[in-house]
């Protein structure tokens, strides 16, 4: 009888001990020896990760995700504690597990201008920000990526430097726009689509295109069913009275704002009316797709794009976190870190951008990470008219979007759509952009409630931390882990030592 009583007491104690061990395993997923010489901070290529908030199958809830051989092998939705014995298991508690971000608009500046950023620092910053795939723009590197030969130079420059996966856009410029064989050579070499400017780009070997160049380029793109990304600003034929006065202070942000009014975006999109119509079913370039990058004007320009979509044109639109986080009224005079093109507009416009994003009229988000060497930002001089335009942002886009989107009621599912699912569709990235069986295990784990201050002590992995407009800001949403192809490439402010991201080429 005594033995039976003792046994009755021991079994519950063993159960408690097992539960405690499980809790310890789950709440402390990484050992102090986190690290290694290879591609991953974890020593396994087959493991489970779990949390109370997994974004998958259009829902957010408890689930465990099996990662095997770089892919998502299975998902167990519901009470995942039963998977404790399927070792190794990493439980992130109530942190969010969602698809890694896909940033379709980043300038990594290599080859030729690695002093601005470069593949190594840019992709390390991306990994620290939960971005698992970047698509690099064809300009700001030198030479610009406008031919098969210049794409090869970029691929050579990227070798052994990629901490996340990287695809490449090619350039549509006057020298190749009217030459189908030249464009086909570039597309056959593997660029995911093309990019053009309707105004001067600021880069000498990347000249602007006109509507004829765009319309002819779309005919070639239609054969490949790849997109044309367009910087939609054009100097109107007749400037209105709101243009800048030569006597205005170049340090005043209002001076720069007046120098690139919404009329520039409106003029460009009006010029694209015929090109957009050509993408409709039965149109001259049916199968092609126009993507408007970094939309800033949430009024007339957005209205024109909404009309084109409703009429059947294949058009998509992105905006960027800096247009959603900042407003013209908040930009300090002389603080050229905030200069970008198109410019950050007023707070009413910012609210309208959020509304359009929530309503689906803006399809997705991108960083438009566009750094430079610090001296080009003219931060001491503070001249907005002469400083390089571009926001340095790769590491911060997820917390910035979440921090400013909370007051507009954004959801985790919307975040995954804007930053993962829709960008994957634009770039033709199959088996990316979702946490689903058979998809590449590109995953970010983050804590939305965790707040942090981007002060001088916060680790920043961009090449030049001092040029970012986000420094000094209080943000919510700490990145805990980033997995690329099943490799844990970033966790606990550590990067995997080897750069094992892959170049992505269209087939």
UniProtKB/Swiss-Prot annotation:
Keywords linked to the UniProt accession: Hydrolase, Metal-binding, Purine metabolism, Zinc
Catalyzed reaction equations: (S)-allantoin + H2O = allantoate + H(+)
GO MF entry, a single one: zinc ion binding
Reported modifications of this chain: Carboxylation allows a single lysine to coordinate two zinc ions.
Binding positions for Zn(2+) 2 per the UniProt entry: 195, 231, 294
Cofactors that this protein relies on: Zn(2+)
Binding site for Zn(2+) 1: 105, 107, 195, 368
Residue(s) carrying N6-carboxylysine: 195
Cofactor note as given: Binds 2 Zn(2+) ions per subunit.
EC top class named in words: hydrolase
EC number(s) per entry: 3.5.2.5
Pathway: Nitrogen metabolism; (S)-allantoin degradation; allantoate from (S)-allantoin: step 1/1
Superkingdom: Eukaryota
GO CC annotations on file: cytoplasm
GO biological process: allantoin catabolic process; purine nucleobase catabolic process
Function, in words: Catalyzes the conversion of allantoin (5-ureidohydantoin) to allantoate by hydrolytic cleavage of the five-member hydantoin ring. Catalyzes the first step of the ureide allantoin degradation followed by the sequential activity of AAH, UGLYAH and UAH which allows a complete purine breakdown without the intermediate generation of urea.
Similarity-based family: Belongs to the metallo-dependent hydrolases superfamily. Allantoinase family.
Subunit structure: Homotetramer.
The protein's name in its UniProt record: Probable allantoinase
Source species of the chain: Oryza sativa subsp. japonica (Rice)
């Amino acid at each position: 009888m005594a033995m039976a009583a003792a046994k009755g007491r021991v079994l519950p104690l063993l159960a408690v001990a097992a539960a405690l061990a499980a809790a310890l395993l789950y709440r402390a997923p990484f050992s102090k020896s986190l690290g290694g010489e290879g591609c991953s901070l974890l020593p396994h290529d087959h493991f489970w990760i779990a949390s109370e908030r997994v974004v998958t199958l259009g829902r957010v809830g408890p689930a465990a995700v099996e990662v095997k051989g770089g892919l998502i092998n299975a998902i167990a939705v519901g009470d995942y504690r039963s998977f404790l014995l399927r070792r190794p298991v990493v439980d992130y508690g109530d942190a969010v597990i969602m698809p890694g971000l896909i940033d379709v608009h980043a300038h990594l500046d290599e080859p030729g201008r690695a002093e601005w950023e470069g593949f190594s620092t840019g992709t390390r910053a991306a990994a620290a920000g939960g971005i698992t795939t970047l698509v690099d723009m064809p300009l700001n590197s030198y030479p610009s990526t406008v031919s098969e030969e210049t794409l090869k130079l970029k691929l050579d420059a990227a070798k052994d430097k990629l901490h996340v996966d990287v695809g490449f856009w090619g350039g549509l410029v006057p020298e190749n726009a009217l030459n189908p064989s030249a464009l086909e050579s570039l597309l056959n070499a593997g660029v995911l689509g093309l990019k053009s400017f309707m105004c001067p780009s600021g880069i000498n070997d990347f000249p602007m295109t006109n509507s004829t160049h765009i319309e002819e380029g779309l005919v070639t793109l239609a054969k490949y069913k790849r997109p044309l990304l367009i910087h939609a600003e054009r100097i109107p034929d007749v400037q209105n009275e709101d243009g800048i006065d030569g006597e205005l202070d170049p340090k005043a942000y209002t001076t720069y704002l007046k120098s690139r009014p919404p009329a520039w975006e409106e003029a460009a999109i009006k010029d694209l009316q015929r090109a957009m119509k050509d993408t409709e079913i039965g149109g001259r370039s049916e199968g092609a797709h126009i993507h408007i990058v970094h939309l800033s004007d949430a009024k007339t320009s957005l209205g024109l794009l909404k009309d084109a979509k409703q009429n059947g044109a294949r058009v998509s639109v992105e905006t960027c976190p800096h247009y959603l986080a900042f407003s013209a009224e908040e930009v300090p005079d002389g603080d050229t870190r905030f200069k970008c093109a198109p410019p950050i507009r007023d707070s009413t416009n910012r609210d309208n951008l959020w509304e359009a994003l929530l309503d689906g009229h803006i399809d997705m988000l991108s960083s438009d990470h566009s750094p430079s060497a610090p001296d080009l930002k003219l931060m001491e001089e503070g001249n907005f008219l002469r400083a390089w335009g571009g926001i340095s942002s790769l590491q911060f886009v997820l917390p910035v979007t979440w921090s400013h989107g909370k007051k507009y009621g954004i959801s985790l599912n919307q975040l995954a759509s804007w930053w993962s699912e829709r960008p994957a569709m634009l770039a033709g990235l199959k088996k990316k952009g979702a946490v689903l069986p058979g998809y590449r295990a590109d995953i970010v784990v983050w804590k939305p409630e965790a707040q942090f201050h981007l002060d001088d002590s916060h680790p920043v992995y961009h090449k030049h931390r001092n040029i970012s407009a986000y420094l000094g800001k209080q943000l919510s949403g700490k990145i805990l882990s980033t997995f690329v192809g099943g490799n844990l490439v970033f966790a606990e402010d550590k990067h995997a030592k080897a750069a094992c991201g892959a170049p992505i080429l269209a087939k």
